[in-house]
Amino acid sequence: MQNQRIRIRLKGFDHRLIDQSTAEIVETAKRTGAQVRGPIPLPTRKERFTILTSPHVNKDARDQYELRTHKRLVDIVEPTEKTVDALMRLDLAAGVDVQISLG
């Protein structure tokens, strides 16, 4: 796998789970002899929702909620066959969305 690069993007609502998952990925890649760049924190997306608490009147009474989506990026440069095999067997947390691209 010469001149290859694996780019892994992680998304989730809990930043502790994402940091734990990136640490597992980096440790696995370094253990198999690959060079790792990252984890790089990407901008956090904040979605805010405003909801009227009263069903009829009192427009001033509102609740506000926020949903934060945290993202991390990990690049694995020049991965070996062992690296790809170890990453495929890696079991990550359920609250983390993982996107893998080869480049």
UniProtKB/Swiss-Prot annotation:
Classify the source by domain of life.
Bacteria
- State the Gene Ontology BP annotations: translation
Alphabetized, the UniProt keywords read:
Ribonucleoprotein, Ribosomal protein
Give the matching SUPFAM superfamilies: Ribosomal protein S10
GO MF assignments: structural constituent of ribosome; tRNA binding
Query: Signal peptide location in the record?
Result: none
Cellular component, GO, one term: ribosome
Record's function text: Involved in the binding of tRNA to the ribosomes.
Family, as annotated: Belongs to the universal ribosomal protein uS10 family.
Oligomer and partners? Part of the 30S ribosomal subunit.
Write down what this protein is called.
Answer: Small ribosomal subunit protein uS10
Lineage at the top is: Bacteria, Pseudomonadati, Pseudomonadota, Gammaproteobacteria, Alteromonadales
